[in-house]
């Protein structure tokens, strides 16, 4: 188990970055997913979209270089590439709902073995709402969940989500600091494992049946 929160997030973001392909239009959700833009190889051309109205979003700026008028969907400072563009949210969501986004990377509170996603509310707590997640999970061609494997020691990958769902059966891939899990028809398939953990540990921290790939390999970070 990796207890260093910042290290865990870095591992996840680096691995998700390796999942993206040259030329794709990619949406990054709020929080951890926005870190992915910092780890794209320089020879790759990935176009990042933010649902508040940016196409061509770049990496996070240095603190002394941040433009207070340029923020991503989570309200964090971001950069925009020279060929980037700004537009209103109606155009942004037309891109999403029209199926033009190749990949969306989202955080989650829970994911289950059916690919169901819960990422917008904990009953009894005040939250801002679902945001664009419900559009993204249905409009994007591939949905990657980027999240810590547990929350305060409790599994976030479950047999069945207990929180209100954002979408049913829409997650394609789950990336945590411990490994990479594909959502397949038979359930959850562990395809990559962090070199600092074991299959037994991952299973003990996962509240769902976990299939092990015959081609299980070290996590590529």
UniProtKB/Swiss-Prot annotation:
Domain of life: Bacteria
Activity-regulation annotation: The acetate and butyrate conversion reactions are inhibited in vitro by physiological levels of acetone and butanol.
Active site: 51
Purpose of the protein: Catalyzes the transfer of CoA from acetoacetyl-CoA to acetate, butyrate and propionate. Also shows low activity with valerate, isobutyrate and crotonate. Plays an important role in the metabolic shift between the acid-producing and solvent-forming states of C.acetobutylicum. Acts mainly to detoxify the medium by removing the acetate and butyrate excreted earlier in the fermentation.
Family label: Belongs to the 3-oxoacid CoA-transferase subunit B family.
NCBIfam families for this protein: pcaJ_scoB_fam
Assembly mode: Heterotetramer composed of two alpha subunits (CtfA) and two beta subunits (CtfB).
Listed name of the protein: Acetoacetyl-CoA:acetate/butyrate CoA-transferase beta subunit
Taxonomic lineage from the root: Bacteria, Bacillati, Bacillota, Clostridia, Eubacteriales
Gene: ctfB
């Amino acid at each position: 188990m990796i207890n260093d929160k910042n290290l865990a997030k870095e591992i996840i973001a680096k691995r998700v970055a390796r999942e993206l392909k040259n030329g794709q239009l990619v949406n990054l959700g709020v929080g951890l997913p926005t870190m992915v833009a910092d780890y794209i190889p320089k020879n790759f051309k990935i176009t990042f979209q933010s649902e508040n109205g940016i196409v061509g979003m770049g990496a996070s700026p240095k603190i002394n270089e941040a433009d207070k008028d340029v923020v991503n969907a989570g309200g964090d400072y971001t950069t925009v590439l020279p060929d980037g563009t700004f537009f209103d949210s109606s155009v942004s969501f037309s891109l999403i709902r029209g199926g033009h986004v190749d990949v969306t990377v989202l955080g989650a509170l829970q994911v289950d073995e059916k690919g169901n996603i819960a990422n917008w509310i904990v009953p009894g707590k005040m939250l801002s709402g679902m945001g664009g997640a419900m559009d993204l999970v249905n409009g994007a061609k591939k949905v990657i969940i980027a999240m810590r494997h547990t929350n305060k020691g409790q599994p976030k990958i479950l047999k069945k989500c207990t929180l209100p769902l954002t979408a049913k059966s829409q997650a394609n891939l789950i990336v945590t600091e411990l490994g990479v899990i594909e959502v397949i028809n038979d359930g959850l398939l562990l395809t990559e494992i962090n070199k600092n953990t074991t299959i037994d540990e991952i299973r003990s921290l996962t509240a769902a049946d976990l299939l092990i790939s015959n081609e299980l390999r070290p996590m590529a970070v």
